[in-house]
Amino acid sequence: MNNEEHKHEEGKRYLKKFEIVETEVELPIQGQVRDPEDLYAFLKDLESEHVPKIIGVYLDQNHLFLGHQVFLGQTSATFDTQVFYHYYLMLLAKRFVILINHPSGDSTPTEDDVKLIKKFQADVQVLSFKPFFSDFIIVAKKSYFSMATNDGTAGHSGNQEHTTKF
């Protein structure tokens, strides 16, 4: 346990205590993440969500899952990429995938989705730590859109409805 002494505004002193606890957690994804099918657990959960949600999935250089962060209530129009990169750096990730749900039930990329994709594409060009943007997946009821597979840059997925290119 670490203790740190602080002074209060009125000159009073107090002792702040905190403890670091290590726990074992089973990762929701095992092995490599190379296409949307590898993220099935996340995709399935997002299909029935009624609240907008963005999930950042963080990977190492070998496409192995390191962790994820859920941003509740976020949409493509409101998402702050700076917060996303905070977690990216904390996990020492090298690659990332963005999962976003469309509660409307339509997995077609919106204008705001396209803007967010372009923002991430611009970010990876200028950031000094050179993150690799692996995919942007939009999940809707019974369908999803994958930027990578619709661009031809990743493995083919049989669950695709749209072939929009960016």
Predicted regions and their residues:
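Alpha-helix N-cap recognition
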Residues: G31-E37
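Short, flexible loop/turn motifs enriched in small residues
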Residues: S48-K53
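Residue-level detector of high-confidence beta-strand sites
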Residues: G67-V70
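Short, basic/aromatic recognition patches
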Residues: D38-L46
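Short beta-strand scaffold segments in enzyme catalytic cores
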Residues: I54-Y58, H63, D135-I138
